[in-house]
Amino acid sequence: RHSDPARRGELSVCDSISEWVTAADKKTAVDMSGGTVTVLEKVPVSKGQLKQYFYETKCNPMGYTKEGCRGIDKRHWNSQCRTTQSYVRALTMDSKKRIGWRFIRIDTSCVCTL
C-alpha cells in the first residue's frame, strides 16, 4: 500500500508477484545463445561459498488479470498479461561441463499485451 495520499487507490494494469529464488530452485536456465545451462547453487569466494539468488517477478495467476489487463476496454481490445524476461549474470555450467559466468534469462516483470 502507498503511504503517499496522492497515490492511494492506484492499481497496476497487471497483477504480479515477486520472490527470491535460489539456484537450487532454478536448476537450469536458458543462456544468451539459447542453450540450456545448469545454474550452480554456490559461488566460490575468498572465504568460502555464497548461494546464488535471483529476484524474479511474474504475473500472478490468482490475480484479476486472468480476464485481461485492468483498465483495458474488453469490448474493443483483446488484452493479456504476460510475464517477460531479462538477462542477468549467473555462474553456470554448460553441456560440455565448462563453468563460467553467463547471462541467463529470468522472469522480471508482468506486462500488458494487446
UniProtKB/Swiss-Prot annotation:
Subunit-structure text: Monomers and homodimers. Binds to NTRK2/TRKB. Can form heterodimers with other neurotrophin family members, such as NTF3 and NTF4 (in vitro), but the physiological relevance of this is not clear. BDNF precursor form: interacts with the heterodimer formed by NGFR and SORCS2. Mature BDNF has much lower affinity for the heterodimer formed by NGFR and SORCS2.
Cellular component terms (Gene Ontology): cytoplasm; extracellular region; perinuclear region of cytoplasm
GO molecular function annotation: growth factor activity
SMART domains found in the cross-reference section: NGF
Post-translational note: Mature BDNF is produced by proteolytic removal of the propeptide, catalyzed by a FURIN family member. In addition, the precursor form is proteolytically cleaved within the propeptide, but this is not an obligatory intermediate for the production of mature BDNF. Can be converted into mature BDNF by plasmin (PLG).
Function: Important signaling molecule that activates signaling cascades downstream of NTRK2. During development, promotes the survival and differentiation of selected neuronal populations of the peripheral and central nervous systems. Participates in axonal growth, pathfinding and in the modulation of dendritic growth and morphology. Major regulator of synaptic transmission and plasticity at adult synapses in many regions of the CNS.
Disulfide pattern: C14-C81, C59-C110, C69-C112
Domain of life: Eukaryota
The name this protein goes by in its record: Neurotrophic factor BDNF precursor form
Family of this protein: Belongs to the NGF-beta family.
Record's subcellular location: Secreted
InterPro entries: Brain-der_neurotrophic_factor, Cystine-knot_cytokine, Nerve_growth_factor-like, Nerve_growth_factor-rel, Nerve_growth_factor_CS
Key words of the record: Disulfide bond, Growth factor, Secreted
